[in-house]
């Protein structure tokens, strides 16, 4: 009797197993994610290479007349930019091969170094004043702009602290992250460099949202930020900055003063037309448009290469932004995602600001066009940040479907 009962139980168990096996076969298998290691993103690398090459050509064309007028080498600015490119290229190579997950350990050290350099600019004779703004320090004949290094410093700080959560009320976050960022913002605002402050604040907001931050808290912070901007505009903003805002939409009110650069930039756009006047044929660079190799280099490109050249450059930046956010979406960890989002937005928004200023959509800001404008600090920092992006792109998530039972 016991033997028959045991056999019955065995048969019942076997039937149950058989039914479950049949159900498992009928049930659709859910995909799971696996981290794979691949080569760096080639599309991103090619895009940056094109931007850098266009930058070399534009810098030489825009700066050669000025160098000749001053009795110097026509390629003087290009040579300096090439030297900075070599430094930036080695930085790109290093960060492409350096595991991005180890960068978090350096966040406070790097932020402290940037704060120290900013203090040298603001409070010591080493600071160099150009066009009323004290933003540079001289090192071995080269001018270094520490505020450019604040971009990766802020991104690294926020990625490190937001990788777990986006709680803005956490006391530890204030001590280790928010206070250093506020110190950097204050030192940069003192130079004054309001455009960089806006760029860093915007990057911080985007990273906060990417980390899953509360929209309610975001709009509260946005309201507080707008109130601060209004107060700053009426109290502590510099007179020349207020004049820029006043003449932004009506530059004809002061054609020889604050509106001069905008008017000359718009003339360059109008002269370029659809296909441009040809490489090297710009008239506006002949002492008409100041800073044509830095802040207004996009206007010279528009004049020489026309609408076609403008679309090409904007398309390259859109490609860079697309690849950067794709890298962020495929990254297997939150730290890498936030790094990719912060770097991509920082470069993309800076390009947007520069192009908007050159085309009179925004007031003059003094922000260079990444990879293209003359400026060693901007080029080195941009290439190093792209190196981090390329490193993140080597590790990505892949969904694997229809895994057979072993």
Where are the predicted features?
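Glycine/serine-rich anion-binding loops at beta->alpha junctions
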Residues: 140-150, 190-192, 273-278, 367-381
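N-terminal membrane topogenic signal
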Residues: 34-48
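Hydrophobic alpha-helical transmembrane segments of multi-pass inner membrane proteins, especially
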Residues: 45-53, 58-61, 68-261, 299-360, ...
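TM-adjacent membrane-interface loops and short helices in multi-pass inner/ER membrane proteins
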Residues: 247, 251-294, 298, 307-309
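Transmembrane helix boundary and interhelical junction motifs in multipass membrane proteins
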Residues: 193-198, 277-282, 292-294, 307, ...
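Short, small-residue-rich loop/turn micro-motifs
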Residues: 63, 269, 273, 359
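A juxtamembrane structural motif centered on a specific transmembrane helix
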Residues: 2-33, 352-406
């Amino acid at each position: 009797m016991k033997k028959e009962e045991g056999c019955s139980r065995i048969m019942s168990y076997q039937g149950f197993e058989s039914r479950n096996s049949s159900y498992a076969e009928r049930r659709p298998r859910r995909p799971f994610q696996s981290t794979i290691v691949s080569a760096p993103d080639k599309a991103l690398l090619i895009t940056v290479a094109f931007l850098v090459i266009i930058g070399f050509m534009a810098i030489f064309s825009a700066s050669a007349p000025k160098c000749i007028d001053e009795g110097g080498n026509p390629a003087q600015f290009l040579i300096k930019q090439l030297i900075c490119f070599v430094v930036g290229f080695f930085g790109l190579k290093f960060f492409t091969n350096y595991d991005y997950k180890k960068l978090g350990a350096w966040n406070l050290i790097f932020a402290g170094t940037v704060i120290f350099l900013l203090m040298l600019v603001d409070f010591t004779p080493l600071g160099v004043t150009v066009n009323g703004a004290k933003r540079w320090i001289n090192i071995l004949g080269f001018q270094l702009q520490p505020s450019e290094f604040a971009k990766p410093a802020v991104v690294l700080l926020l990625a490190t602290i937001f990788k777990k959560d986006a709680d803005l009320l956490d006391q530890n976050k204030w001590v280790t992250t928010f206070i250093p960022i506020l110190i950097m913002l204050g030192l940069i605002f003192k130079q004054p460099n309001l455009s960089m402050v806006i760029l860093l604040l915007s990057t911080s907001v985007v990273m906060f949202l990417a980390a899953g931050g509360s929209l309610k808290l975001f709009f509260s912070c946005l309201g507080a930020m707008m109130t601060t901007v209004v107060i700053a505009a009426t109290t502590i903003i510099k007179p020349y900055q207020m004049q820029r805002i006043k003449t932004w939409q009506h530059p004809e009110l002061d054609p020889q003063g604050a509106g001069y650069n905008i008017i000359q930039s718009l003339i360059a756009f109008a002269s370029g037309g659809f296909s441009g006047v040809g490489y090297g044929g710009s008239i506006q660079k002949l002492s008409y448009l100041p800073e044509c190799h830095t802040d207004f280099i996009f206007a010279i490109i528009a004049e020489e290469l026309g609408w076609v050249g403008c679309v090409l450059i904007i398309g390259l930046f859109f490609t860079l932004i697309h690849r950067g956010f794709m890298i962020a979406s495929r990254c297997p960890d939150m730290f890498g995602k936030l790094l990719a989002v912060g770097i991509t937005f920082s470069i993309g928004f800076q390009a947007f600001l520069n192009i908007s200023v050159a085309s009179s959509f925004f007031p003059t800001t003094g922000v260079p066009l990444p990879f293209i404008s003359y400026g060693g600090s901007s080029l080195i920092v941009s290439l190093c940040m792209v190196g981090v992006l390329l490193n993140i792109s080597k590790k990505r998530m892949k969904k694997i479907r229809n895994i057979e039972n072993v």
